[in-house]
A protein has these predicted regions:
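Transmembrane alpha-helices and adjacent helix-loop boundaries
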Residues: 1-313
Length: 313
């Protein structure tokens, strides 16, 4: 056999003079369940829209009162009391979490008692207790330092701040405690070996690492605080729900103003949910190799998949 014949490839499928390979035709998977569920959801939404459109609701009033000065003032007060109460709750949460983990049995017991009491009683009851505290103590007397009537000290804002902030502090204490305990004890031991004090170790080593565990539930707590703040309308604080209810009672548009309040609550929670999402991504950078896609990245990926499906057809 000569070299020419040895170098010639054997005849077979796809060679010259034979039937060429056929291109593979990819058939996309049909997700019939998704289409069925989408139709069911669309029908239910259509039914709800139709039901509300036929009800005795003046939708023009909703649009007219959406930016009413009283409503916007109540909206601002809602944000102020929510941020203030959350800040107080966060400070108290860190303090009582550290006390709870202390080796001192007295401070640990005091922290446990605080958490047990404020988590075990409804926040609405706590607000009413603060609001009616003047029935028990007519004066707040600190001796030569300060003395004043309780009614003058416990304004609606102070009542709302104490009621929401102290209650939130109990929940934040458990969240912070779980975050601190998630950090390996070797980190603290190494810090002590380097000569750091307990407070320096907590501030520079433990808490920064614990933030990955603390941030997600803290964001949820703040969003919940925005909605829980509606309870302070019972103690005369002029927040969003109270402002809307006052207008609704005066104008005879109670349901319309409840819809106005709901729209603003949804707007606030949506805005802060986006902020929470990106804050979680920031603190997840050191723990995840690949960060979860953002909503815009998911939308882009879905559009690309849809285009590839159309091309395949």
């Amino acid at each position: 056999m000569d070299k020419g014949s040895a170098a010639t490839p054997p005849a077979g499928p796809g060679a010259s003079g034979t039937t060429p390979y056929e291109a593979i035709k990819a058939i996309p998977v049909r997700h019939y369940g998704r289409w069925i569920s989408a139709v069911v959801v669309a029908v239910l939404l259509g039914w709800l829209v139709y039901a509300f459109s036929q009800g005795k609701i003046i939708w023009a009033t909703v649009g007219d009162k959406l930016f009413d000065p009283s409503v916007l003032s109540g909206l601002g007060n809602t944000v102020i009391i929510s941020v203030s109460s959350m800040a107080l709750g966060l400070v108290l949460g860190i303090l009582f979490a550290v006390m709870r983990l202390s080796k001192n049995p007295v401070t640990s017991f005091v922290s446990w008692l605080y958490i047990w009491f404020f988590r075990g009683t409804p926040v609405y009851v706590q607000l009413l207790v603060w609001f009616n505290l003047s029935l028990i103590f007519q004066y707040i007397n600190l001796g030569p330092i300060y003395k004043n009537e309780t009614v003058d000290v416990l304004t609606p804002f102070m009542v709302a701040l104490l009621g929401l902030g102290l209650n939130e502090g109990a929940y934040m204490a458990e969240i912070v405690r779980s975050g601190i305990q998630s950090v390996d004890e070797g980190q603290s031991e190494a810090s002590h070996a380097l000569g750091m004090t307990g407070m320096q170790t907590m501030r520079r080593v433990v808490l920064p690492q614990a933030m990955r565990v603390i941030i997600p539930p803290t964001g949820n707590e703040f969003i919940n605080m925005l909605k829980t703040s509606s309870l302070v309308s019972a103690v005369q604080y002029p927040e969003l729900l109270r402002a809307s209810s006052n207008i609704g009672t005066t104008a005879g548009a109670i349901m319309e103003m409840l819809f106005v309040a709901s729209i603003w609550y949804l707007t606030l929670t949506s805005i802060f949910s986006v902020g929470q999402y990106y804050l979680e991504r920031r603190y997840a950078r050191g723990s995840l190799r690949t960060l979860p896609p953002t909503p815009f990245e998911r939308l882009k990926a879905n559009l690309n998949m849809f285009r590839r499906t159309e091309v395949a057809k």
